Amino acid sequence: MKENKKINFVMPANYDHASGGYKIVYQYANWLDDQGFDVSICYGYAPNDSKLYAALKRIVDMRIFKFSKRKTNLTWFKLNPKIKSYYNCVFSKDIPDSDVVFATAATTAYFVNGLPEEKGEKFYFIQGYEAEGFGNKKGFVENTYNLGMTNIVISNELKSKVLDSGSAEPKYLPNFYNHNEFYLENPIKDRQNMICLLNHTQETKRTKFGLEILREVKKTIPNLEVQLFGAYEPFEKLEDWIHFTKNANTEQLRKDIYGASKIYLMPSVLEGWALTAMEAMASGAAVVSSHIGGIVDYANDSNSILIEPDNKAEFVNAIMNLLQNDEQRIAVATKGSEDVKQYVIDKSGERLLKIINSEI
């Protein structure tokens, strides 16, 4: 594909909240722009609604009474200046013509699939299993895998989900992290008894379960401190040893959260690709995680501690063992920080171009 080709990413609505899935798309957009491609990003208004209903809602929302939290700007991530953004798209005329167009979520799949030919060759970038827990009806996400677009998955578990739906084998495109943002700034060895945990409203992230685990650990490790972080306010009153940072920037994450913690706890039961755990590894935190498909593409028993998702006692014991055995913690954290270095955007970006060009 020549450098002047046009590539368009179609996203769900923009609420200007930090999101791992959005961040991956934005990083690909910047990388493609750096390679000389003409890149645009389109945000749907309500891509799951009928076009007439979505158009009526948009008119009311944008011109009469602002009732939604949709935004027409992006403040938490810096896109390259040449990348064009289109907000609150409803009709195909709202979407620029391109050579390649990506659906980036289940809610955008039908919309992209229905675009006319001049909008580009259609690819479906599948970053997570967006089933009933994401507000979709049973079978909806499986149907999106069978629309006929070229499916791209970021993990082997998602590959299995797509195959189980009856679709053809998807293209595998592993994720990456930004090595300029996350690296070993603070020594692994000299850290306080601090653990970090993501605060999230999505039930599959299981923030509440994570806090229950940490409160059990606190009974045995009285000087335990917790760094809770996320884009949403905590859903419960927190003890004074649990510190919350809202919308932490990358420097705060690298220095004060991941980089100051001995352990990153990830009790999630569903991940497309666990970006936060990878960032934590790169910053020197030992990862204690649920043994789920979204992490095992890069995590194993030598560079992390993987626990059966509902075994609370095992989570507690694993964390206490690491806090009480510095040699083991340092070994796990060091191995993790080394192992994730292979996941770079240049490698993933080149693979993406090969997928677009039908070379793999």
Task: Label each PLM-derived region with a short phrase.
Residues 301, 305-312, 321-326:
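Conserved acidic donor-binding segment of nucleotide-sugar-dependent glycosyltransferases
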Residues 314, 321, 328-342, 351-354:
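A short, well-ordered alpha-helix in the C-terminal region of glycosyltransferases
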Residues 232-255:
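Nucleotide-activated donor-binding/catalytic signature segment of Leloir-type glycosyltransferases, i.e.
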Residues 8, 152-153, 187-205, 211-218:
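Conserved donor-binding/catalytic core segment of Leloir-type glycosyltransferases
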Residues 237, 292-306:
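Short acidic/histidine- and often glycine-rich active-site loop of Leloir-type glycosyltransferases
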Residues 131-137, 164, 171-191:
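Acidic anion/phosphate-binding donor-loop and adjacent secondary structure
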Residues 269:
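Aromatic "clamp/platform" in nucleotide-sugar-dependent glycosyltransferases that forms part
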Residues 286-289:
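Short hydrophobic beta-strand element within catalytic cores of glycosyltransferases
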